């Protein structure tokens, strides 16, 4: 059994597709089909077997999943999370991070004072957006770029942004 610390979320089943038990898979890998090159597991560490049927214009994958053969079975998988083992992932270049490693990191201002944390990292197709939860419990969304986040480390993130009063 694997702890969630040893797993990286690489995809989620969005919905069923058609009547043969196919599922629509949102892959978090780049390119999306890279997910198929990994040993995939669920939260409990059980192996998952996925076979690509096709890819739509949004980059979502239409796949067969384990032994699912009917639409009814596939409908029960909506929201199902797919992981791979952290140890199986390639070494990252400098200034590259896995989303799982950035989520919940403290955010510091230019004076290195903690002002919040990364709540989530989102992508709606035009680039990564960082959702910040500030110390006063308010949240804001900012694009993930060097202008707003000039320094990102494995331990903290520096934010170059003045909030409106």
Swiss-Prot record:
Top-rank taxon, per record: Bacteria
Gene Ontology biological process terms in this record: ribosomal small subunit biogenesis; rRNA processing
Key words of the record: Chaperone, Cytoplasm, Ribosome biogenesis, rRNA processing
Keyword rRNA processing: yes
Cellular compartments annotated: Cytoplasm
Any GO MF annotation of the entry: ribosome binding
Major localization class: cytoplasm
PRC barrel domain residues: 94-165
Cellular-component GO terms for this entry: cytoplasm; ribosome
Keyword rRNA processing: yes
Subunit organization: Binds ribosomal protein uS19.
Entry note about domains: The PRC barrel domain binds ribosomal protein uS19.
HAMAP family attached to this UniProt entry: Ribosome_mat_RimM
Record NCBIfam families: 16S_RimM (TIGR02273)
Function: An accessory protein needed during the final step in the assembly of 30S ribosomal subunit, possibly for assembly of the head region. Essential for efficient processing of 16S rRNA. May be needed both before and after RbfA during the maturation of 16S rRNA. It has affinity for free ribosomal 30S subunits but not for 70S ribosomes.
Similarity comment text for this entry: Belongs to the RimM family.
Protein name as catalogued: Ribosome maturation factor RimM
Organism phylogeny: Bacteria, Pseudomonadati, Pseudomonadota, Alphaproteobacteria, Rickettsiales
